[in-house]
């Protein structure tokens, strides 16, 4: 009886939950985040953003355009958690097992590229691009503040060049 329960638990951990998470993430890719207070659909929001007559003031029109533009960057916490979990499961399943047979056969290039991409997606936080407008150049002085040769000659009594240059 315990063996059956252990096998069912292993089956759930290996197959059921990762595939369920993968299905949830795959189904939710490309869909905008649905807010709880707004019951509009995609067609209504696109029609409303294109209808200039409904926006009475220009600042409201700008806010509508910015909200439509920013909606692709808003990611729900649980959606992001599910994506990271699926990426982690995929990266563990694609990692080769350490054995003598697996060590002799190298991984194909596409598997290595996929592992690198999954690692980058898992470790780097996605942020929208930001334009940096105010940049200042650093002032670099051409003459060094401290001459080692002068210090050696004055403090230690060691001459590091001709006597006319040191005095």
UniProtKB/Swiss-Prot annotation:
It comes from the Bacteria. Residues 1-36 form the signal peptide. The keyword Mitochondrion does not apply. Keywords: Cytoplasm, Periplasm, Signal. InterPro entries: SecM. It is found in: Cytoplasm, Cytosol; Periplasm. Its main location: cytoplasm. Regulates secA expression by translational coupling of the secM secA operon. Translational pausing at a specific Pro residue 5 residues before the end of the protein may allow disruption of a mRNA repressor helix that normally suppresses secA translation initiation. This is Secretion monitor. It comes from Erwinia tasmaniensis (strain DSM 17950 / CFBP 7177 / CIP 109463 / NCPPB 4357 / Et1/99).
């Amino acid at each position: 009886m315990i063996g059956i329960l252990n096998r069912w638990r292993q089956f759930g951990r290996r197959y059921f939950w990762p595939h369920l998470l993968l299905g949830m993430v795959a189904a939710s890719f490309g869909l905008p985040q649905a807010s709880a207070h707004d019951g509009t659909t995609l067609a209504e929001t696109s029609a409303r953003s294109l209808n200039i007559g409904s926006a009475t003031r220009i600042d409201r029109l700008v806010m509508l355009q910015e909200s439509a533009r920013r909606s692709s960057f808003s990611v729900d916490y649980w959606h992001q958690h599910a994506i990271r979990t699926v990426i982690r499961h995929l990266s563990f399943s694609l990692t080769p097992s350490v054995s003598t047979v697996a060590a002799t056969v190298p991984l194909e290039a596409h598997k290595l590229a996929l592992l690198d991409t999954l690692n980058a997606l898992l470790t780097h936080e996605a942020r929208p691009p930001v334009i940096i407008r105010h940049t200042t150049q650093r002032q670099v002085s051409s003459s060094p503040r401290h001459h080692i040769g002068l210090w050696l000659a004055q403090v230690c009594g060691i001459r590091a060049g001709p006597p006319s240059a040191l005095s």
